């Protein structure tokens, strides 16, 4: 039987406010345990929550960016459950009237096509504290620094049909919230976490299968692996005559499998009711206009502009628009070099490889946009070849200066004098007289392969400095003359 996968995601984004959603406590990461928890965060009697307006502004900004309905009358509710790191015994969230309603996001896929994923809603809520198991022998410690940190939970429609589509969607959300400046997107620190709802159904069936939720997956790689693992489990279970039970599961990356955590709850299990300590939030049209005026150029628009303005492919434009910093870096390089495609290639390949190797972000790049753009100018004016440029790039990354300084200091200037190149070729051909005879006796098909040998020898003889185009032209003339 052929199966169709159905995936919906819930993405929890920690908002980059300076203080918590209902108290004045700091949200800074990495503080000593329980040093950033106020009486409000601890759920002490006699204290009342006060809504952080900046969290509201950030939620509205996201809603406008995904063309969503904005809940201009939205209500906070109490989500009741017991867990050691939830001091009040309930979480303040939103249920029936969220701040962001239906919207959508267009995401780029690997094959260069676009897919629209519906967004069901996005609601504000407070984060819980953190249970610490490893630091205590046979016991659990509770750190409430995180309790009350503002979260925007973004709930998608079940529109994704593969793990790769799910990852593409998470990457698009990740890029968007970073562009907006509402979340730093640091998955390692838990700033962006993902719950994956996965089910399968026979191909062609309209009705959904029974879904399982994989909780708190915190990397793109693990999202793909966790979903694929759960897909395999469900298919094997059904094909062996079993039945999928609705439950919450955890992904174990060491065993590459999901394991049950608890039975999956429904909304009524949490006994939601409006929080009597918080008034409904009323958002005026004037506030929406203010927020709309602050929206930057977003990834979809930037991607589209890169394609139209620079003639880039969907893939290249999508990669370069991944973050504002990378897009700005690329545009600066392209502006200096006057060649967007050359700039795109160097930013994505050479610079990307360097950053991955050194574990750096684009804003920490050891080669500035001005340096890279200046080097590309030297490729374009034939001062250096593409091969020599890699040596220059490496030297710039090691702090040896800009391209012109390195070229002069190391004597890397390309030889473009046809007389000098001709002399090098004559010497090289004389040293390879036997191969020259074989080339001249060979048919056209074999000559193509043999020609590469002579080009390699010529570049070696010139220490890589001869202009490759001139080498090709002169060499062809000499071999066939």
Swiss-Prot record:
SMART domains: GatB_Yqey (SM00845). GO terms for biological process: glutaminyl-tRNAGln biosynthesis via transamidation; translation. GO terms for molecular function: asparaginyl-tRNA synthase (glutamine-hydrolyzing) activity; ATP binding; glutaminyl-tRNA synthase (glutamine-hydrolyzing) activity. Its EC number is 6.3.5.-. It is an enzyme of class 6 (ligase). Coiled coil: none annotated. The keyword RNA-binding does not apply. It catalyses: L-glutamyl-tRNA(Gln) + L-glutamine + ATP + H2O = L-glutaminyl-tRNA(Gln) + L-glutamate + ADP + phosphate + H(+); L-aspartyl-tRNA(Asn) + L-glutamine + ATP + H2O = L-asparaginyl-tRNA(Asn) + L-glutamate + ADP + phosphate + 2 H(+). Pfam families: GatB_N, GatB_Yqey. Keywords: ATP-binding, Ligase, Nucleotide-binding, Protein biosynthesis. Heterotrimer of A, B and C subunits. Allows the formation of correctly charged Asn-tRNA(Asn) or Gln-tRNA(Gln) through the transamidation of misacylated Asp-tRNA(Asn) or Glu-tRNA(Gln) in organisms which lack either or both of asparaginyl-tRNA or glutaminyl-tRNA synthetases. The reaction takes place in the presence of glutamine and ATP through an activated phospho-Asp-tRNA(Asn) or phospho-Glu-tRNA(Gln). Belongs to the GatB/GatE family. GatB subfamily. This is Aspartyl/glutamyl-tRNA(Asn/Gln) amidotransferase subunit B. The gene is gatB.
